[in-house]
Amino acid sequence: MEPWLWCERYSIPDRIEPELMTDTQYTHGHHESVLRSHRWRTADNSAEYLLPHLRSGMSLLDIGCGPGTITIDLAKRLAPGRVTGVDPCADVIAQATAAGAGESTVEFRVGDVYDLAAAVAPASGYDVVHAHQVLQHLADPVAALREMRRVCRPGGLVAARDADYAAMAWYPRPPALNNWLELYQQVARSNGAEPDGGRHLRSWAHRAGFSQVTSSASVWCFSTEQERQWWGSLWADRVTSSDFAEQATTRGFADEQQLTEIATGWRNWAADPDAWFAVLNGEILCRA
């Protein structure tokens, strides 16, 4: 089968309704190629829209904290305020706990965004509840935002930032990367997720009951040789070795040869000195 015929041969619903999903499978999984990108994230490169609103002494809950780099960065800024990171993956929480061992104001717990009882909120609620690249992966992001609001103090902030895959831009545009985008969207939506979540954040917040919502957007750009090699190699590895690869093949969206062709396309793209990639991220600040 030719790679450009994937979408014609394999059709799936545009959206799997949340009520049909009891759990959402994480599209990326926790392969090293995934965690490599997660560990790159900091408050400066991933939460700049939130930083002007933070003050020393604030309490903060970080949803889907992963290996904890953003969480720990935020804890340093908010000390002596308490910062808690939660993630459903116990192995990743163990990594985050080890990384934050030297910070007395941060702790990590296994937790579920739909039921944040494990977060042990302060009596009055957290000053800030934050989620980075989380809502796009959920079957019911509106329910998640409601739960985030529940553990936020009245007048506090609920903040979220998510990529929008359909709005990503790159040059040059080899067929392999176009096929990658189509395949990623197929796999993500088969998990009940919304890969173009960035554009939906404002709507989701309104549906969750927020009336004061400030929207913004920002971009990650990869263009230097080091940036291209890092971005291209991690996606080449994800395409062939992560949970995404397993989901794509077991569900009949692609075979191993097609995944190898996409991975080669990523490496060839990264080697081109003219190459450039931009990831658009939607952002919201919601007053609880």
Name every feature range the model reports, one short phrase each.
Residues 61-63, 67-116:
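Class I SAM-dependent methyltransferase SAM/SAH-binding core
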Residues 142-157:
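A short glycine-rich, Lys/Arg-flanked "PGG" loop and its adjoining helix->strand segment in the class I
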Residues 40-56, 73:
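Conserved alpha-helix/loop element of class I SAM-dependent methyltransferases that forms part
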Residues 115-129:
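A short acidic, Gly/Pro-enriched loop at the edge of an enzyme's catalytic core
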Residues 22-42:
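Class I SAM-dependent methyltransferase Rossmann-like catalytic core
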Residues 159-229:
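Conserved catalytic/acceptor-binding region of the Class I
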Residues 212-288:
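Conserved Class I S-adenosyl-L-methionine
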Residues 127-140:
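A short SAM/SAH-binding and catalytic strip from SAM-dependent methyltransferases
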